[in-house]
Each structure stands twice: as C-alpha cells, then as structure tokens.
C-alpha cells in the first residue's frame, strides 16, 4: 500500500509540472512563453495548436484532480481499529460513582472543619434557640 502511494505521489508531481508547463505555453495574443518559441504564430503544432494545448491542459488538470482524490482515499485514516472500543472499555473499568467518592480537596476541607472548635455560646445559640444577652 505504501509503495502504491509513493508511485501515485510521484505521478502527481509529474502531472503538476506538466500542468504548469502547459499553462505557461498557452499563448494569449502571443504574450505567453509559447510565443517566445514560435515567434508569436500559432503554427508550431499546425493550425489547431491552441486547441491541442487547451485540450491537453484540461486532460492534465482532470488527471491531477483524479490522482489527488485517489491519493486521499489511499491515505485516509482507518475507520475504527478498536482503539475507540478499547478507550470505552478502559473508561468503563475506571468509572466510579463520583458522588460516593469525594475528591481529596473535599476530604481535606471536611477534616479542617471538624478540627475547628466552635465556641459553646455559638453552639448554644443555634441549638437551644436562646437569644443573645
């Protein structure tokens, strides 16, 4: 699979270079690089040279897109290799009822509050309902 991917990638590079070359060779009123080699006339490939270059460019661009999509299909990530299932299984194994097991910060806070000595009058105010003198 890797060898096929490398071969298609190499072919894609060649097609890219051909597309660039063909686009540069096409003349637009004799201004392009094609005019430099043929003196501005369209007689390099006969009377239909522009249509030949244009059609060849279309074919190469189509080949470029086809190879690009095929290469993307070859190199796509696999659907589900079991990694998702393994992660879900691990999560299920380590899942705990969080409301029954408070975090360490809550336990520390509970211990600090239990060590806090409240004045007896304060406890009496709340416990017996007596008023403040």
UniProtKB/Swiss-Prot annotation:
<feature type="transmembrane region" description="Helical">
    <location>
        <begin position="52"/>
        <end position="72"/>
    </location>
</feature>
<keyword id="KW-1133">Transmembrane helix</keyword>
<keyword id="KW-0653">Protein transport</keyword>
<dbReference type="Pfam" id="PF03840">
    <property type="entry name" value="SecG"/>
</dbReference>
<dbReference type="GO" id="GO:0009306">
    <property type="term" value="P:protein secretion"/>
</dbReference>
<dbReference type="GO" id="GO:0015450">
    <property type="term" value="F:protein-transporting ATPase activity"/>
</dbReference>
<keyword id="KW-0811">Translocation</keyword>
<dbReference type="GO" id="GO:0065002">
    <property type="term" value="P:intracellular protein transmembrane transport"/>
</dbReference>
<comment type="similarity">
    <text>Belongs to the SecG family.</text>
</comment>
<keyword id="KW-0472">Membrane</keyword>
<dbReference type="GO" id="GO:0043952">
    <property type="term" value="P:protein transport by the Sec complex"/>
</dbReference>
<protein>
    <recommendedName>
        <fullName>Probable protein-export membrane protein SecG</fullName>
    </recommendedName>
</protein>
<keyword id="KW-0813">Transport</keyword>
<keyword id="KW-0812">Transmembrane</keyword>
<dbReference type="GO" id="GO:0005886">
    <property type="term" value="C:plasma membrane"/>
</dbReference>
<feature type="transmembrane region" description="Helical">
    <location>
        <begin position="3"/>
        <end position="23"/>
    </location>
</feature>
<keyword id="KW-1003">Cell membrane</keyword>
<comment type="function">
    <text>Involved in protein export. Participates in an early event of protein translocation.</text>
</comment>
<dbReference type="InterPro" id="IPR004692">
    <property type="entry name" value="SecG"/>
</dbReference>
